[in-house]
Structures are given as structure tokens and as C-alpha cells.
């Protein structure tokens, strides 16, 4: 039986709107700051610049350029009901970002096949999965959320700073939990990964096994 709410939503203002502007061709960084909803970021063949598809009943999602950063932001508001937006960000195939920042309150975010020189993830109670390539430093901070990184490369390509409460952090074959102080692992690598976890979970997987 169909949920009557669904039909209301479909006939309401929750159409998908596609946002793209010539200025997006200048984007070197992508900054996504969303309070709730479902976000998907992936590469797409046949487009020349970043494109954002937004389905947001309350039209709170904003996309704009700030110098060389494309910002996709959504302010939390007091909304009736729990209608969460769906946002799809398409990046041209082979387009390497200088930096990808994901700040998710309670949102669910999947990033697939994206290459960036720096990755920053901050989540409260959300769930984030990043599958792709990071040719640089990684910072992950989660409260009670779940973050999974599926990275190209190997575990010894990074140095690590790991901080963990009652949650757990898995990096390749290493497992960390209930750390009384920040743990540093120096692999004499060119890049550093900072992982900070409260009661959530962070899992980092690599496609090259040591």
C-alpha cells in the first residue's frame, strides 16, 4: 500500500532541479555542508563541469561559488515533518579536485570514484562512504557517525594520527579503540591521515594489501 505522504510529496515542490553555472568550470574545491538528507557524489562521462541535482521540498539547499570553491550548503530549519533532501553532485570524469570537504550533520553521503588532493570529513550522526583516490592528506572526525574510506593505494602511503573514544577505528589490518591518548604512526610517508572518533566508527580500506 502506498504511503499517502509519498504522493503528496511527488505532487508538491520536490521536483529535481539541476544547478550548473559556467562559473563552476573554475571549481578546484568542493565543499558540501548538509544537515540531513541523502547525498551522492560521483564522476560522470560527457559533462565538462560540475553539475548538482537537487530535490529539496523546502528549497534550503544553496549552490554557489566562493572564489575557486563550489559550496553546496543546506541550513537546518524548523521544518514540519522530516522531509530530507536528495542531492546528487556529478563531477566530470578524470576531474581531480584540489580538496573535497564533507560536513554532514545527520546526512547520509556516498562518494564514488572521485579523485582529490585533500579530503576532509566531519560528521555528527551521519554515515559517509568515500571510495576513490586521495593524493594528499586526509582528516576525518566523527561523533557517533560511521565513516568508511575505500582508498586506492596502500596503508603505508600515509602517516597516521589516531584518536578514539569508545568507538572504533580500523585502518587496513590495524584496530584501535578506547585510546587514552592520540596515537601517532610514522611511516615516513608523504601524506598524513588524521582520524578522530567519538562513539562512532571509522574504517579505512586500501586496494593494495601490504
Locations of the language-model features?
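Short linear S-[DN]-x-LW-Φ motif typified by the pepsin-like aspartic protease active-site region
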Residues: 2-73, 90, 109-113, 149-153, ...
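N-terminal start-of-chain detector that recognizes signal peptides
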Residues: 12, 22-26, 61-63, 91-95, ...
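Short amphipathic alpha-helical surface micro-motifs
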Residues: 13, 32-34, 53-56, 70-72, ...
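A generic local structural motif
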Residues: 16-18, 87-89, 108, 127, ...
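Short, surface-exposed interaction patches in beta-rich subdomains
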Residues: 17, 45, 64, 75-80, ...
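The right-handed parallel beta-helix/beta-solenoid scaffold, focusing on the short coil/turn
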Residues: 28-30, 37-39, 48-50, 68, ...
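Extended Gly/Ser/Thr-rich low-complexity repeat segments
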Residues: 42-43, 79-95
Amino acid at each position: 500500500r502506498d504511503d499517502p505522504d509519498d504522493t503528496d510529496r511527488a505532487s508538491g515542490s520536490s521536483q529535481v532541479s539541476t544547478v550548473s553555472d559556467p562559473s563552476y568550470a573554475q571549481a578546484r574545491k568542493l565543499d558540501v555542508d548538509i544537515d540531513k538528507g541523502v547525498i551522492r557524489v560521483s564522476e560522470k562521462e560527457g559533462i565538462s563541469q560540475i553539475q548538482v541535482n537537487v530535490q529539496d521540498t523546502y528549497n534550503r539547499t544553496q549552490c554557489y561559488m566562493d572564489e575557486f570553491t563550489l559550496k553546496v550548503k543546506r541550513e537546518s530549519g524548523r521544518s514540519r515533518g522530516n522531509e530530507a533532501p536528495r542531492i546528487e553532485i556529478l563531477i566530470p570524469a578524470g576531474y581531480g579536485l584540489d580538496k573535497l570537504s564533507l560536513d554532514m550533520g545527520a546526512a547520509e553521503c556516498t562518494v564514488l570514484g572521485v579523485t582529490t588532493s585533500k579530503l576532509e570529513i566531519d560528521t555528527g550522526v551521519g554515515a559517509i562512504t568515500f571510495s576513490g583516490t586521495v593524493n594528499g592528506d586526509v582528516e576525518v572526525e566523527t561523533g557517533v557517525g560511521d565513516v568508511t574510506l575505500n582508498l586506492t593505494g596502500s596503508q603505508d602511503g600515509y602517516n597516521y594520527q589516531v584518536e578514539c573514544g569508545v568507538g572504533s577505528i580500523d585502518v587496513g589490518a590495524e584496530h584501535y579503540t578506547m585510546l587514552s591518548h592520540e596515537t601517532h604512526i610514522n611511516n615516513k610517508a608523504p601524506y598524513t591521515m588524521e582520524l578522530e572518533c567519538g562513539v562512532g566508527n571509522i574504517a579505512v580500506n586500501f586496494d593494495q594489501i601490504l
